[in-house]
Amino acid sequence: LTFLFASAKIGAILVTVNTNYKQHELEYLVENADIHTLCISNGTFDSDYVDMTYTMLPELKTSQRGHLKSNKFPYMRNVVYIGQEKHRGMYNTAELLLLGNTITDEKLEVQKQKFNCYDVVNMQYTSGTTGFPKGVMLTHHNITNNGYCIGQCMKFTENDRV
Protein backbone atom coordinates (compact mmCIF):
# COMPACT_ATOMS: atom_id res chain seq x y z
CA LEU A 1 0.00 0.00 0.00
CA THR A 2 2.89 2.35 0.64
CA PHE A 3 3.92 2.20 -3.01
CA LEU A 4 0.31 2.76 -4.10
CA PHE A 5 -0.09 5.92 -2.03
CA ALA A 6 3.41 7.20 -2.81
CA SER A 7 2.96 6.79 -6.56
CA ALA A 8 -0.45 8.47 -6.41
CA LYS A 9 1.02 11.40 -4.49
CA ILE A 10 3.63 12.13 -7.17
CA GLY A 11 1.38 11.53 -10.17
CA ALA A 12 2.89 8.19 -11.21
CA ILE A 13 0.71 5.41 -12.57
CA LEU A 14 0.83 2.21 -10.53
CA VAL A 15 0.40 -0.90 -12.67
CA THR A 16 -0.73 -3.85 -10.59
CA VAL A 17 0.71 -7.24 -11.51
CA ASN A 18 -1.02 -10.56 -10.96
CA THR A 19 1.17 -12.49 -8.50
CA ASN A 20 0.46 -15.71 -10.41
CA TYR A 21 1.98 -14.40 -13.65
CA LYS A 22 4.55 -16.57 -15.33
CA GLN A 23 7.64 -15.20 -17.08
CA HIS A 24 6.02 -14.55 -20.48
CA GLU A 25 2.98 -12.85 -18.88
CA LEU A 26 5.15 -10.51 -16.83
CA GLU A 27 7.20 -9.63 -19.91
CA TYR A 28 4.02 -8.90 -21.88
CA LEU A 29 2.75 -6.56 -19.16
CA VAL A 30 6.08 -4.73 -18.76
CA GLU A 31 6.28 -4.13 -22.51
CA ASN A 32 2.60 -3.30 -23.01
CA ALA A 33 2.41 -0.83 -20.12
CA ASP A 34 5.77 0.85 -20.88
CA ILE A 35 6.90 0.21 -17.30
CA HIS A 36 9.56 2.63 -16.03
CA THR A 37 10.07 1.24 -12.52
CA LEU A 38 9.35 -2.32 -11.42
CA CYS A 39 8.83 -3.03 -7.70
CA ILE A 40 9.24 -6.68 -6.74
CA SER A 41 9.35 -8.91 -3.67
CA ASN A 42 10.81 -12.41 -3.27
CA GLY A 43 7.79 -14.07 -4.81
CA THR A 44 4.88 -16.25 -3.87
CA PHE A 45 4.37 -20.01 -3.93
CA ASP A 46 6.46 -21.30 -6.85
CA SER A 47 7.37 -17.90 -8.35
CA ASP A 48 10.77 -16.32 -7.71
CA TYR A 49 10.35 -12.68 -8.77
CA VAL A 50 14.03 -11.85 -8.42
CA ASP A 51 14.97 -14.68 -10.78
CA MET A 52 12.14 -13.76 -13.18
CA THR A 53 13.35 -10.15 -13.22
CA TYR A 54 16.96 -11.11 -13.97
CA THR A 55 15.74 -13.44 -16.74
CA MET A 56 13.63 -10.65 -18.23
CA LEU A 57 16.33 -8.00 -17.77
CA PRO A 58 19.76 -9.67 -18.07
CA GLU A 59 21.36 -6.20 -18.29
CA LEU A 60 20.25 -5.55 -14.72
CA LYS A 61 23.11 -7.63 -13.27
CA THR A 62 25.69 -5.24 -14.75
CA SER A 63 23.72 -1.97 -14.53
CA GLN A 64 24.08 0.74 -11.94
CA ARG A 65 20.90 1.21 -9.95
CA GLY A 66 18.62 3.71 -11.67
CA HIS A 67 20.50 3.50 -14.98
CA LEU A 68 19.13 0.35 -16.55
CA LYS A 69 19.14 0.31 -20.33
CA SER A 70 17.22 -2.64 -21.72
CA ASN A 71 17.04 -3.37 -25.43
CA LYS A 72 13.82 -5.33 -25.02
CA PHE A 73 12.12 -2.88 -22.62
CA PRO A 74 13.28 0.63 -23.58
CA TYR A 75 11.24 2.46 -20.93
CA MET A 76 12.53 0.39 -18.00
CA ARG A 77 15.00 2.30 -15.85
CA ASN A 78 14.62 1.08 -12.26
CA VAL A 79 13.94 -2.06 -10.29
CA VAL A 80 13.10 -1.81 -6.59
CA TYR A 81 13.28 -4.83 -4.33
CA ILE A 82 10.68 -4.50 -1.56
CA GLY A 83 12.78 -5.57 1.41
CA GLN A 84 16.23 -5.03 2.86
CA GLU A 85 18.14 -7.63 0.82
CA LYS A 86 20.51 -6.21 -1.76
CA HIS A 87 20.35 -7.45 -5.35
CA ARG A 88 22.61 -6.34 -8.19
CA GLY A 89 21.17 -3.42 -10.15
CA MET A 90 18.17 -3.01 -7.82
CA TYR A 91 17.36 -0.48 -5.14
CA ASN A 92 16.12 -1.96 -1.89
CA THR A 93 13.44 -0.29 0.23
CA ALA A 94 15.91 1.56 2.48
CA GLU A 95 17.81 2.94 -0.53
CA LEU A 96 14.59 4.04 -2.18
CA LEU A 97 13.54 5.90 0.95
CA LEU A 98 16.91 7.68 1.04
CA LEU A 99 16.33 8.87 -2.53
CA GLY A 100 13.35 10.80 -1.17
CA ASN A 101 15.80 13.03 0.69
CA THR A 102 17.21 14.25 -2.64
CA ILE A 103 13.92 15.95 -3.55
CA THR A 104 13.06 19.24 -1.88
CA ASP A 105 9.60 19.91 -0.49
CA GLU A 106 9.25 22.64 -3.12
CA LYS A 107 9.94 20.21 -5.98
CA LEU A 108 7.45 17.76 -4.49
CA GLU A 109 4.78 20.47 -4.33
CA VAL A 110 5.45 21.47 -7.95
CA GLN A 111 5.10 17.83 -9.01
CA LYS A 112 1.86 17.40 -7.06
CA GLN A 113 0.35 20.43 -8.82
CA LYS A 114 0.89 18.86 -12.26
CA PHE A 115 -2.02 16.42 -12.00
CA ASN A 116 -5.68 16.38 -11.00
CA CYS A 117 -8.39 13.92 -10.03
CA TYR A 118 -9.04 12.98 -13.66
CA ASP A 119 -5.49 11.77 -14.30
CA VAL A 120 -4.77 8.05 -14.41
CA VAL A 121 -3.42 6.69 -11.12
CA ASN A 122 -3.72 2.93 -11.58
CA MET A 123 -3.70 0.46 -14.45
CA GLN A 124 -5.13 -3.00 -13.87
CA TYR A 125 -4.93 -5.77 -16.44
CA THR A 126 -7.87 -7.97 -17.37
CA SER A 127 -7.54 -11.72 -16.95
CA GLY A 128 -7.02 -12.26 -20.67
CA THR A 129 -9.50 -15.11 -20.98
CA THR A 130 -10.58 -13.99 -24.48
CA GLY A 131 -7.17 -12.86 -25.70
CA PHE A 132 -4.17 -10.99 -24.36
CA PRO A 133 -4.81 -9.07 -21.12
CA LYS A 134 -5.73 -5.43 -21.64
CA GLY A 135 -4.75 -2.55 -19.37
CA VAL A 136 -7.71 -0.74 -17.79
CA MET A 137 -6.84 2.80 -16.75
CA LEU A 138 -8.39 4.14 -13.55
CA THR A 139 -8.29 7.78 -12.48
CA HIS A 140 -8.08 9.16 -8.96
CA HIS A 141 -11.76 10.06 -9.34
CA ASN A 142 -12.71 6.52 -10.50
CA ILE A 143 -11.20 4.94 -7.42
CA THR A 144 -12.50 7.52 -4.95
CA ASN A 145 -15.97 7.51 -6.47
CA ASN A 146 -16.07 3.70 -6.43
CA GLY A 147 -15.40 3.72 -2.68
CA TYR A 148 -18.02 6.41 -2.17
CA CYS A 149 -20.66 4.51 -4.16
CA ILE A 150 -19.97 1.27 -2.30
CA GLY A 151 -20.38 3.14 0.97
CA GLN A 152 -23.69 4.55 -0.26
CA CYS A 153 -24.96 1.11 -1.32
CA MET A 154 -23.96 -0.37 2.03
CA LYS A 155 -25.60 2.55 3.83
CA PHE A 156 -22.41 3.56 5.64
CA THR A 157 -22.52 6.73 7.73
CA GLU A 158 -19.81 8.89 9.26
CA ASN A 159 -20.21 6.79 12.43
CA ASP A 160 -19.15 3.54 10.72
CA ARG A 161 -15.57 2.24 10.74
CA VAL A 162 -14.31 -0.01 7.99
Give the predicted meaning of each segment.
Residues L1-F5:
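Cytochrome P450 catalytic-core helices
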Residues I10-L98:
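Structural core segment of the AMP-binding/adenylate-forming
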Residues N32, F73, K114-C117, F156:
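Alpha-helix termination/capping residues and helix-transition junctions
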Residues Q84-Q124:
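Extended low-complexity acidic/polar segments
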Residues K112-F115, V121-N145:
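Conserved AMP-binding A3 loop
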Residues Y118, N142, C153-V162:
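Conserved AMP-binding loop of ANL adenylate-forming enzymes
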Residues Y148-Q152:
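Generic structural signal for well-ordered alpha-helical scaffold segments
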